[in-house]
């Protein structure tokens, strides 16, 4: 406290004259320590000496460069402290905006599920949603039982220690060294023997619930996880109901007139009209234009031939008749015998036009007779307008030819029959009534293809057709564009507080160290998460603390849901070595006090002087290896407290026995050495007396006034993150959710007005099948439909093999500057991947909920006794994870006693994660035991419920202290220290609102009809009629 003890160094002899003689004395009392000189240069390391007797512990030397990282050691055997109370889950953050749904691709053919693909690189972190407010702190959970301790491995061989030389001047700090390459992994050794199980301790009484801490600022949301492997394609969906008939296509423009077809067969003459004046018998006229088939009438008798009259004047043109309804095609009639030609008579006058008689049924045509003499040409009737071209029908049986009237609109064009012989031109007859359609005849030969007619009038929309057979699944379409970020949803409701659980067992109550209590510093703002720093120095084993009295038991709460994995914190920097206090006499054990009520946490006290190393206590059985908790975020570092004045001097305690020396830790990067304050005067060392019994505890020291706060040094350099481990397999596939509702059907387009049809052209030979045209452009996006039902979550995949740790990167230079503002959390490092499960179906991703913020750190509990639970099984060595970001500098804890190796327990099943507790202060480090061989990894045990933290023990009697020197300025930060304890994971944010599944959009406008392709080969199916047309399915 007042300076260093240099009595172990060789002292020069002192001469003293006495009565003319001269004799030499031993070392005299040590004078006051002068101010510290400037640091000298670092000397070169000397050769390794032979192992000598263990000397007094020397002052810590400069930290050497970080060596290669060795294999992971066995799990520590520290006593499990009480877990803090669990906080209420935070209010969920607002979900992001829902993205625009991409275009639906074509349904692909279902392929066989492929092998799980290589896991892709982690995607870029998504945009952080607005953090939700942190909820109130929940009731403390019930403390879990201490599991069985893991086996202790065999102790490694200690390196030979050279003789301790005199302490040289402290040189100036050199530049940070480069990190060494990773060392080879050690081999597995034999498993140790199983030790006996100790008795279970009594259960503690129920304590009072703790007071809820204030609500802190919201934390940053966690980064997105790694992308999972794509799931196998699902089964093809059931074919949907057929859609409504699409709108009629727009007919193309009128094509050029085709070639004239062959002449039809000459039909039988129609019924005779009213008798005219007698004229000469005319010759048979040429066949007139074929009229449309009319309704069937009885066959009329042929009237007698009238006498030839004089040719009358041409009558007026008949009225234009409307197009008749299309009748079914009649059957082909048999060809009849053509009668002999009559003698030509004189042309008589045209008689009065009689009423049109009913058209008789078409008779069988007669055989063609001999050609008669040419008769006089008849009058040509006026030409009618050209009617629209209908679909080519099958030729019906020719009906009788009536008298030619005014030319009406052309009916449906039938297939032209074989060309018959040309007849003589005759007179134009009147147009008869349409007869009933005859039976459907056999199809005639193919006619010529006519030119495409103008657009027809809009047809009436047909009814919904019957569902056709399901076609083969289409090919998989291209993925649609990524949607934009959706709006943030409203925060969710506050969760229900958990029930009050039973209290956990009381922890042992430890003695308080001396030192004045300083005020608690304000919580600083959190700085940005830096990259992981290199491994720090491994600390020397500390002194064994005396067991403390038991504190009150905390009440237990129900375990909450497992929190999301936080960002792993880096290793904290090693703090400066405190001054070594003088050895005091051992006081007697104080009476054990009754547990007091839990008080509000007081301000943090200043760090006391380091005492002498006590004797190692009996080793209790090692506790079980707990389930590895998710690493929490690094909390903000508070400012340094003021150093208080020293308390009153107590009686010095007896010097404890030196504990077993642990294995040498790895060397970290050398940090610059801070200036040392002025030393106080050191008293002379007396001879060590025999160890007496422990005396009664002295009265508590007077609390001094807090000193001024020191400045915090700049953070150490950050290391480079190693490469991620190999990816794991995908998880199991979840159940497929039902399909969303179908969107509304689009409005049918309007058909343009129809134009007049063209004539039928000659039909060419069938061409080769044409190639498929390019797909039409996609229609507009449809309205969003109702959201589908959320499918059941997939089962969690099994834990996979660990990835190989990457090499530690080269550290950057040491930066000096004020702490920066808190930045967003970094991406999640590669963890242990699960075994490959069935691939889940890709669903709409929900918005990431923001992680809960870290609660205020609870007051530091006293160190408990070693547990005596059953021994757990040896676990397999875990993988070296990637180096996480550097955490805040934790206070260096006092080392605990060395525990003996416990027996190996059976592998327990992995239990569910316990509730998230608030982040506690960093505990005191225990003495490092002998290094054992890595055991097989056991299953994670059940995480117990947290108990209430025990109250602070009474302050012990302070040791003699010298006058406190002035506090020197804070030196630059040293290299990063060892990893701090894993923090409690943050609360899992609520799942985002699932976006609604978009509904099917309206149908796009129909494209223009393409040119008719050649008929393909028949593919089977069946014919059905619709609106008078025949279709093949």
Swiss-Prot record:
Bias (Pro residues) ranges: 1003-1015
Sequence ranges of Gly residues compositional bias: 276-285, 318-327, 459-468, 551-560, 692-701, 749-758, 812-834
UniProt cross-references to Pfam families, sorted A to Z: Collagen (PF01391)
S-adenosyl-L-methionine is among the record's keywords: no
Biased composition, class Low complexity, residue ranges: 25-71, 154-175, 221-242, 286-296, 340-356, 391-410, 519-528, 540-550, 583-627, 634-654, 672-682, 703-712, 766-793, 801-811, 873-909
Region (Disordered): 1-1033
Keyword annotations from UniProtKB, A to Z: Calcium, Collagen, Extinct organism protein, Extracellular matrix, Hydroxylation, Repeat, Secreted
Subcellular location: Secreted; Secreted, Extracellular space; Secreted, Extracellular space, Extracellular matrix
Composition bias type Basic and acidic residues, residue spans: 655-664, 919-930
A cellular component term, taken from the record's GO annotations: collagen trimer
Entry comment describing in which tissues the protein is expressed: Expressed in bone.
Keyword Nucleotide-binding appears in the UniProt entry: no
Main location: secreted
General function of this protein: Type I collagen is a member of group I collagen (fibrillar forming collagen).
Complexes and interactors: Trimers of one alpha 2(I) and two alpha 1(I) chains. Interacts (via C-terminus) with TMEM131 (via PapD-L domain); the interaction is direct and is involved in assembly and TRAPPIII ER-to-Golgi transport complex-dependent secretion of collagen.
Membership in a protein family: Belongs to the fibrillar collagen family.
Protein name: Collagen alpha-2(I) chain
The organism of origin for this protein: Mylodon darwinii
Annotated gene: COL1A2
């Amino acid at each position: 406290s007042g300076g260093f003890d240099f009595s172990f160094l060789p002292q020069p002899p002192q001469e003293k004259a006495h009565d003319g003689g001269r004799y030499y004395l031993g070392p005299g009392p040590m004078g006051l320590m002068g101010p510290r000189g400037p640091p000298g240069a670092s000397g070169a390391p000397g050769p390794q000496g032979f192992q000598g007797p263990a000397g007094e512990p020397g002052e810590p030397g400069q930290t050497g460069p970080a060596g290669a990282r060795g294999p992971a050691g066995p799990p520590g055997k520290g006593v499990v402290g009480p877990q803090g109370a669990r906080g209420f889950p935070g209010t969920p953050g607002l979900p992001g905006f829902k993205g625009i749904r991409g275009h639906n691709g074509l349904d692909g053919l279902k392929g066989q599920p492929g092998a799980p693909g290589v896991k892709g690189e982690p995607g870029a972190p998504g945009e952080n949603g607005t953090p939700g407010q942190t909820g109130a702190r929940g009731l403390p959970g019930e403390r879990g039982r201490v599991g069985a301790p893991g086996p202790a491995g065999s102790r490694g061989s200690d390196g030979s220690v050279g003789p301790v030389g005199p302490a040289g001047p402290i040189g100036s700090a050199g530049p940070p060294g480069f990190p060494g390459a990773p060392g080879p992994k050690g081999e597995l050794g034999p498993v140790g023997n199983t030790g006996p199980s100790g008795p279970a301790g009594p259960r503690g009484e129920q304590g009072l619930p703790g007071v809820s801490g204030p609500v802190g600022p919201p934390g940053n949301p966690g980064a997105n996880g790694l992308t999972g492997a794509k799931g196998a394609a699902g089964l093809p969906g059931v074919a949907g109901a057929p859609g409504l008939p699409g709108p009629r296509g727009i007919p193309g423009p009128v094509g050029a007139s085709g070639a004239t077809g062959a002449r039809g067969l000459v039909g039988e003459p129609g019924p005779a009209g009213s008798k005219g004046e007698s004229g000469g018998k005319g010759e048979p006229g040429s066949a007139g234009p074929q009229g449309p088939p009319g309704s069937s009438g009885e066959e009329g008798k042929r009237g007698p031939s009238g006498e030839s009259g004089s040719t009358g004047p041409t009558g007026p043109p008949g009225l234009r008749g409307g197009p008749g309804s299309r009748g079914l095609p009649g059957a082909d009639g048999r060809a009849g015998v053509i009668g002999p030609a009559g003698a030509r008579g004189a042309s008589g006058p045209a008689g009065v036009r009689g009423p049109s008689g009913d058209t008789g049924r078409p008779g069988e045509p007669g055989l063609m007779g001999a050609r008669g003499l040419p008769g006089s040409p008849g009058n040509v009737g006026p030409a009618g307008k050209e009617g629209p071209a209908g679909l080519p029908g099958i030729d019906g049986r020719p009906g009788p030819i009536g008298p030619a009237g005014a030319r009406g609109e052309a009916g449906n064009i039938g297939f032209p029959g074989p060309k018959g012989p040309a007849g003589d031109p005759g007179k134009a007859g009147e147009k008869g009534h349409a007869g009933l359609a005859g039976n459907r005849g056999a199809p005639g030969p193919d006619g010529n293809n006519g030119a495409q007619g103008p657009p027809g009038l809009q047809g009436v929309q047909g009814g919904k057709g019957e569902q056709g057979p399901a076609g083969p699944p289409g090919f998989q379409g291209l993925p649609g564009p990524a949607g934009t970020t959706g709006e943030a949803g409203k925060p969710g409701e506050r969760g229900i507080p958990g029930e009050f659980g039973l209290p956990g067992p009381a922890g042992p109550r430890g003695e308080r160290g001396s030192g004045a209590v300083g005020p608690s510093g304000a919580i600083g703002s959190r700085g940005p998460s830096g990259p992981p720093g290199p491994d720090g120095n491994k600390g020397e084993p500390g002194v064994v603390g005396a067991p403390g009295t038991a504190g009150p038991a905390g009440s237990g709460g129900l375990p909450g849901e497992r929190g999301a994995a936080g960002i792993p914190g880096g290793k904290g920097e090693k703090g400066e070595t405190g001054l070594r206090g003088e050895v005091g006499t051992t006081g007697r054990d104080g009476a054990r006090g009754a547990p007091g009520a839990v008080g509000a946490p007081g301000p943090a006290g200043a760090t006391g002087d380091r005492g002498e190393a006590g004797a190692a206590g009996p080793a209790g059985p090692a506790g079980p290896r707990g389930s590895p908790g998710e690493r929490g975020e690094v909390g903000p570092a508070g400012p340094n407290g003021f150093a208080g004045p020293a308390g009153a001097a107590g009686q010095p305690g007896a010097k404890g026995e030196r504990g077993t020396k642990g294995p040498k830790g790895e060397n970290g990067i050398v940090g610059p050495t801070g200036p040392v304050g002025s030393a106080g005067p050191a008293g002379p060392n007396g001879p060590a007396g025999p160890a007496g019994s422990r005396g009664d505890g002295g009265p508590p020291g007077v609390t001094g006034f807090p000193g001024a706060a020191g400045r915090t040094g700049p953070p150490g350099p950050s290391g480079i993150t190693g490469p991620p481990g190999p990816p794991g397999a995908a998880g199991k596939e979840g159940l497929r959710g039902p399909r969303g509702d179908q969107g509304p059907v689009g409005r049918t387009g309007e058909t343009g007005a129809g134009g007049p049809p063209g004539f039928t052209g000659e039909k060419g030979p069938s061409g080769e099948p044409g190639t498929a045209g390019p797909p039409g452009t996609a229609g507009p996006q449809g309205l969003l439909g109702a959201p589908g039902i959320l499918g059941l979550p997939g089962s969690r995949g099994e834990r996979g093999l660990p990835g190989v740790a990457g090499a530690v990167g080269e550290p950057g230079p040491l930066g000096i500057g004020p702490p920066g503002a808190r930045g967003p959390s970094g991406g999640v490092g590669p963890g242990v991947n699960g075994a490959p499960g069935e691939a889940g179906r890709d669903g709409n991703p929900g918005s990431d909920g923001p992680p809960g913020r870290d609660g205020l750190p609870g007051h530091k509990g006293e160190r408990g006794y070693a547990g005596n639970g059953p021994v757990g099984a040896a676990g397999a060595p875990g993988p070296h994870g990637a180096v996480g970001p550097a955490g805040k500098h934790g206070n260096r804890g006092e080392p605990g006693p060395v525990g003996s190796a416990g027996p190996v327990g059976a592998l327990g099943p992995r239990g569910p994660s316990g509730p998230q507790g608030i982040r506690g202060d960093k505990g005191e480090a225990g003495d490092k035991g002998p290094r054992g061989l890595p055991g097989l990894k056991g299953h994670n045990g059940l995480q117990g419920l947290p108990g209430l933290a025990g109250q602070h023990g009474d302050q012990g009697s302070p040791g003699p202290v010298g006058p406190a020197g002035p506090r020197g300025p804070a030196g630059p930060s040293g290299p990063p220290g060892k990893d701090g304890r894993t923090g409690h994971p943050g609360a899992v944010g609520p799942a985002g609102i699932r976006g609604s599944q978009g509904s099917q959009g309206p149908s796009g406008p129909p494209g223009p009809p393409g040119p008719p392709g050649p008929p393909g080969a028949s593919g089977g199916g069946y014919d059905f009629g619709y609106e008078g047309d025949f279709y093949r399915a």
